[in-house]
């Protein structure tokens, strides 16, 4: 067996938005001579489509819900506690399994939502690095909230002017979000004791916020974690995310349809793998987009929320509704004019990295703050204004926002800014770029001497 420079065990939080970026980081490490093993819970392993040719090894661990996953847990706190109990035991089993091999595990890269993994790393004498899947700005606000025992004072010094509506939702928790709020705060309980802090961003994008975080502890930005083919092309065969929780049959249909559309003419609408819009909000979107050519991804579980008879009225020559789309292929297609997004960090990074202006419709978690930066800091889009009482964005506001991004007074500026961020993303990952330097620093310090 080939002796590698070291062996990194990557332990993501078990949801697709956390699994994907840490897996992409594994590909970068593998390209630099490291063996990488990526853990997946048994339930997720049994439900994903995994590329068998991937160079990344997979090890299964347990969250205590091997047959039903998160949805079979009685509550969020129950799931998190059982994941800690069963996860720490089964991750330890993975480490022991490799101890006497030619490539024993030397480092754990773990999701920042799992601070218990640091204790596990120390128990086995391993290098440890939490992986923060959100932006430097969001991480800094969450850190301040933790430092101040869950409270924040606005405005926040050294950050753009933030209003309550711009803050991550877990910073102002409701009873239903309390477990998530505690999970967000727990990221910072022991992170200063780790050997490295890894953040899925790139220096040029939020260098000021990176500097603020670095005053607390040293930070290495190692993003964007978008497949190399779309950016720097340094990692061979890194053409896509190579795992997905959804059926891939519609990919060819999607690409074929986009090929038939004029350049920059299509509004791409997608709200990620978890966001659940109300029926009222789905109706407002449906009524707002009738004058546009659009590709709208509506998960099968959300279809019942569409207005009665709406699907029958869609002009199939001009528009397309699918349950799933190959998002990177879509965003990189010349037919796409803008991206209407929930502003999850992965989707936001994809939009920025592929140079696509955005219509921001944040739902929860870090998304409101990402939307703030999309509009006011990176200047690549517009945030759709929702009504204060209902929280619903009305059809007129949605239609106006799409028009502004597609053809409004600032449309040209937004497109130019989007292209600028795309170029900077490519530069950061290319040889000698900020992210490339940071990854090289990381691997030089964890390699076996």
Name each model feature, range by range:
Residues 1-449:
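Glycosyltransferase specificity loop/lid
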């Amino acid at each position: 067996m080939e002796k590698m420079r070291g062996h990194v065990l990557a332990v993501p939080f078990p949801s697709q938005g956390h699994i994907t970026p840490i897996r992409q980081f594994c590909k970068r490490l593998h390209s630099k001579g490291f063996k990488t093993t990526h853990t997946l819970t048994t339930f997720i392993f049994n439900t994903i489509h995994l590329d068998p040719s991937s160079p990344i090894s997979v090890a299964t661990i347990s969250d205590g819900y091997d047959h039903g996953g998160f949805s079979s847990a009685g509550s969020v706190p129950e799931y998190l506690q059982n994941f800690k109990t069963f996860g720490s035991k089964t991750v330890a089993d993975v480490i022991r399994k490799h101890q006497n091999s030619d490539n024993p595990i030397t480092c754990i890269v773990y999701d920042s939502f799992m601070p218990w993994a640091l204790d596990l790393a120390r128990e086995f004498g391993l290098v440890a690095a939490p992986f923060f899947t959100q932006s430097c700005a969001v991480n800094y606000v969450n850190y301040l909230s933790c430092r101040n025992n869950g409270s924040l004072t606005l405005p926040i010094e050294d950050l753009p002017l933030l209003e309550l509506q711009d803050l991550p939702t877990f910073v102002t928790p409701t009873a239903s979000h309390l477990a998530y709020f505690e999970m967000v705060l727990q990221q910072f309980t022991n992170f200063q004791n780790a050997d490295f802090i890894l953040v899925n961003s790139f220096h040029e994008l939020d260098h000021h916020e990176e500097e603020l975080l670095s005053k607390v502890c040293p930070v290495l930005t190692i993003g964007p974690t978008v497949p190399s083919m779309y950016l720097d092309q340094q990692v061979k065969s890194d053409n896509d995310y190579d795992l997905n929780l959804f059926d891939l049959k519609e990919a060819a249909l999607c690409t074929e349809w986009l090929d038939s559309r004029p350049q920059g003419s299509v509004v791409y609408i997608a709200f990620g793998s978890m966001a659940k819009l109300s029926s009222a909000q789905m109706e407002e979107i449906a009524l707002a987009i009738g004058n546009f050519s659009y590709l709208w991804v509506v998960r099968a579980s959300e279809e019942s929320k569409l207005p009665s008879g709406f699907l029958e009225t869609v002009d199939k020559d001009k528009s397309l509704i699918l349950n799933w789309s190959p998002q990177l292929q879509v965003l990189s297609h010349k037919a796409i004019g803008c991206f209407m997004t929930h502003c999850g960090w992965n989707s936001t990074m994809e939009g920025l990295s592929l140079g696509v202006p955005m219509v921001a419709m944040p739902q929860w978690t870090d998304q409101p703050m990402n939307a703030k930066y999309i509009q006011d800091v990176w200047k690549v889009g517009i945030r759709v204004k929702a009504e204060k009482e209902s929280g619903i964005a009305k059809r007129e506001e949605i239609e106006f926002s799409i028009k502004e991004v597609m053809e409004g007074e600032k449309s040209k500026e937004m497109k130019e800014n989007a292209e600028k961020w795309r170029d900077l993303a490519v530069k950061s990952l290319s040889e000698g770029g900020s992210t490339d330097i940071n990854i090289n620093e990381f691997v030089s310090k964890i390699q076996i001497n």
